[in-house]
């Protein structure tokens, strides 16, 4: 079963939310404030901690009557097991909710948007730079990496003045592996070699080497046309006339210049080419900016892809050489979907896909002190819960409520916990460090959950350290696994 918000989901009419006793007040408050466009009910099962549920246990303990009218059941996001087990028993769609109930409003907003999200019409060409200087193994590894990152075409970048006798074999190997291949060179012999081996795109031709394109007639190979060196857009005309006469498909690249070397003027050239040639295919080398701008590449790629989407530039060339551009191909893949959605839906590129928000968070979800005090009143076990907000860290259990705004000194917080078990101390130290980082960067913290780094976010811990520690501390497995017992997760 697809999680709520997945592409192709159906808008529900009535939703049944399943939760535990501790989370019930917060869940009801979130739903009340959300005022969702569907009817809903909340079912509180016989368990304190919702995160300790499994789908098998829910299937045994949940009671859904046909008269309830629910067409969607939302179970806790941290619940383990296959939701299909519940769906098969009750004949209703069952999906996991967000791991943090505070994300429910945004979660359902995304579900609606996701039904229209994911399409793209910008092709990504990923360049392997200085290919002649790399081993065959390194070239294949780079190509595999770029393809897995979302590249549509693998560009073999030749080096001017350096012989590349293996070019044909490299192109053939990549094509045999199911990849589409282009070659980046002005050298006519290298162009002929690569095309003979199966390359489908040539970067680039201008007045200096356009005659080689005559040899490509009938192959279906596309060429990228750039202005003559030092020339204006007017120098494109002669090359375009020849390519049209020879029936060679082409893309126009007016050349994106780095900041400090005419960046703004180069953007204007792209707009001018679109005005002069409204039907022409175009390419933009966005790597010229990401590689030469000391800034995280996520935002740079987002803006450049947005420009391409609005101008109808249907191909981009990028690479990942400098460290701050690592992940640029994946970023372009996310950006082309986001910007396609924004432009075609005539909306802002927000609220549907936050994977390009990496260092900061789209929203910082917190609890107030009153909410945490109310939560503490319902806790009966000594296991510590850790919370973070914009100003500090709170740690609480059934007896202690510790609050600190000095997040750079988590040792002071730890000293007040009275923990002497090494494993428990390690666990709490890890969580406090993560909470401190969240406060420092302005991110949402969720105990035992990975901080959000956008498309770079690692998976959450697969096994709850806190549950495991609870089991050991109490000397019995029942404490953490018997749903009738109080647990350790809120």
Give each language-model segment a name.
Residues 16-20, 30-37, 219-357:
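Catalytic alpha/beta core domains of metabolic enzymes, predominantly
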Residues 53-56, 78-85, 104-106, 160-172, ...:
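Active-site-adjacent beta->alpha loops and helix N-cap segments on the catalytic face
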Residues 73, 150, 184, 252, ...:
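Conserved, mostly hydrophobic/aromatic
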Residues 91, 161-193, 216-225, 270-284, ...:
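Alpha-helix-loop-beta-strand connector modules within alpha/beta enzyme cores
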Residues 94-99, 154-160, 179-187, 199-213, ...:
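Catalytic beta/alpha-barrel core
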Residues 120-141, 228-232, 289-298:
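Active-site mouth loops of central-metabolism enzymes
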């Amino acid at each position: 079963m697809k999680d709520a918000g997945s592409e192709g989901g159906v808008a529900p009419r009535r939703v049944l939310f399943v939760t535990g006793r501790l989370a019930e007040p917060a869940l009801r408050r979130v739903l009340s404030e959300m005022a969702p466009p569907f009817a809903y009910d909340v079912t509180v099962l016989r368990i304190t901690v919702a995160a300790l549920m499994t789908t098998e246990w829910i299937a045994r303990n949940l009671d859904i009557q046909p008269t309830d009218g629910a067409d969607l059941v939302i179970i806790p996001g941290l619940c383990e097991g296959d939701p299909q087990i519940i769906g098969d028993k009750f004949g209703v769609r069952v999906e996991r909710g967000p791991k943090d109930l505070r994300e429910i409003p945004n979660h359902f907003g995304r579900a609606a948007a996701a039904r229209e999200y994911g399409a793209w019409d910008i092709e990504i060409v990923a360049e392997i730079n200085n290919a002649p200087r790399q081993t065959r193994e390194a070239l294949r590894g780079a190509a595999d990496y770029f393809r897995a990152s979302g590249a549509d075409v693998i560009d073999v970048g030749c080096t001017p003045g350096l012989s590349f006798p293996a070019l044909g074999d490299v192109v053939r190997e990549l094509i045999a592996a199911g990849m589409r291949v282009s070659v980046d060179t002005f050298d006519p012999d290298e162009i002929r070699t690569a095309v003979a081996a199966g390359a489908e795109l040539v970067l680039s031709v201008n007045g200096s080497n356009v005659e080689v394109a005559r040899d490509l007639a009938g192959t279906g190979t596309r060429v990228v046309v750039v202005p003559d060196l030092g020339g204006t857009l007017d120098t494109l005309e002669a090359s375009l006339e020849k390519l049209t006469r020879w029936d060679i498909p082409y893309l126009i690249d007016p050349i994106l210049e780095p900041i400090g070397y005419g960046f703004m003027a180069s953007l204007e050239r792209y707009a001018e080419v679109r005005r002069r040639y409204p039907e022409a295919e175009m390419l933009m080398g966005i790597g010229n900016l990401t590689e030469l701008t000391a800034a995280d590449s996520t935002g740079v790629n987002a803006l450049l892809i947005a420009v391409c989407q609005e101008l109808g530039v249907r191909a981009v060339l990028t690479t990942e050489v400098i460290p701050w551009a690592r992940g640029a191909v994946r970023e372009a893949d996310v950006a082309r979907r986001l910007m396609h959605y924004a432009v075609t839906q005539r909306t802002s590129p927000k609220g549907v896909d936050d994977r390009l928000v990496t260092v900061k968070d789209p929203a910082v979800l917190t609890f107030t002190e009153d909410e945490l005090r109310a939560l503490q009143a319902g806790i009966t076990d000594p296991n510590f819960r850790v919370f973070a907000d914009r100003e500090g860290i709170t740690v609480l259990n059934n007896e202690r409520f510790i609050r600190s705004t000095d997040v750079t000194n988590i040792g002071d917080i730890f000293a007040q916990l009275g923990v002497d078990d090494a494993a428990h101390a390690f666990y709490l130290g890890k969580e406090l460090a993560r909470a401190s980082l969240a406060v420092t960067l302005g991110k949402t913290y969720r105990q035992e959950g990975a901080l959000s780094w956008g498309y770079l976010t690692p998976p959450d811990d697969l096994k709850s350290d806190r549950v495991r520690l609870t089991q050991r501390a109490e000397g019995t497995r029942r404490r953490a696994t018997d749903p009738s017992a109080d647990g350790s997760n809120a």
